[in-house]
Design a protein with these regions (language model features):
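Histidine-anchored nucleotide/phosphate-binding helix
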Residues: 31-45
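Short, glycine-rich nucleotide/cofactor-binding loops
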Residues: 15, 20-35, 58-64
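Aromatic- and Gly/Pro-rich donor/ligand-binding loops
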Residues: 124-126
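A glycine-rich helix N-cap at a beta->alpha junction
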Residues: 67-96
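Acidic, glycine/proline-rich low-complexity segments that act as flexible tails and inter-domain linkers
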Residues: 2-12
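Short, basic, glycine/proline-bearing loop/turn elements
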Residues: 55-59, 97-99
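A short aromatic-anchored loop/beta-hairpin motif
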Residues: 74-76, 100-114, 121-122
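Short internal beta-strands
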Residues: 39, 50-56, 83-89
Length: 126
């Protein structure tokens, strides 16, 4: 079994270069100090070729209500992070329009998430 912690950078290049981050927590500290920070850095620093942020559940409400987090997400989108959100949750929470205004692709996420998993994306959940 390959241990990615002991691999050299060149060896890591042979591994999957795609990351999907599933953001479900409504906790602001988790959002600011872990989820959004790492996700943005992963794209900006080229750690992954493709980085997807999926807003799902209570994170939808947190993002819709927090202007500082909105600015972070806008910057992530400008830097190439793919922004998606699960419409069933955002509709239930009444925040779909706010997410759309941030440039987030709000849609059914069952099939896209399943595709990410089957295509070997690295998946982080916050």
């Amino acid at each position: 079994m390959v241990n990615p912690l002991t691999m050299k950078a060149e060896e890591l290049k042979d591994q999957t270069e795609k990351l999907a981050v599933l953001w479900v927590s409504g906790d602001r500290d988790v959002a600011e100090k872990s989820c959004l920070m790492y996700t943005h850095a992963a794209k900006r620093n080229g750690w992954f070729d493709e980085v997807v942020l999926i807003v799902w559940g209570s994170s939808s409400r947190l993002l819709a209500e927090d202007e500082a987090l909105q600015e972070k997400v806008r910057a992530m989108g400008k830097d190439g992070v793919i922004l998606e959100a699960y419409i069933a949750c955002s509709d239930q929470l009444g925040v779909t329009e706010e997410l759309l205004e941030l440039g987030i692709d709000v849609k059914g996420m069952g099939v896209p998430l399943t595709t990410y998993l089957k295509e070997g994306y690295h998946v982080l959940t916050y």
